[in-house]
């Protein structure tokens, strides 16, 4: 969590985590998670492609909507593999201050 006032992404991640054990009949998130990590990854990919299409088209409102869907599905996919938003933030913190070229070279 991010301090005393969690961001919207942290609140969403907390909601997704709470729905992991919920009834798939009453929660879309629980239903998606019950289908397994592969289905969650597939949905993330679909939403990412839709965001890319809207970015190319230049429709700002649709891009914002698709970006929100993409972030939701990214968090669901991460939750399906027990990866938290904090885990990802820690990785970003680790990379902070390094050039992208230097960081990418260190992964080879």
UniProtKB/Swiss-Prot annotation:
Cited Pfam families: PRA-PH (PF01503)
Protein name: Phosphoribosyl-ATP pyrophosphatase
Annotated EC: 3.6.1.31
Keyword Hydrolase: yes
Native organism: Paracoccus denitrificans (strain Pd 1222)
Pathway of action: Amino-acid biosynthesis; L-histidine biosynthesis; L-histidine from 5-phospho-alpha-D-ribose 1-diphosphate: step 2/9
Classification via Gene3D superfamilies: MazG-like
Region (Disordered): 88-108
Biased composition (Basic and acidic residues): 91-108
HAMAP family: HisE
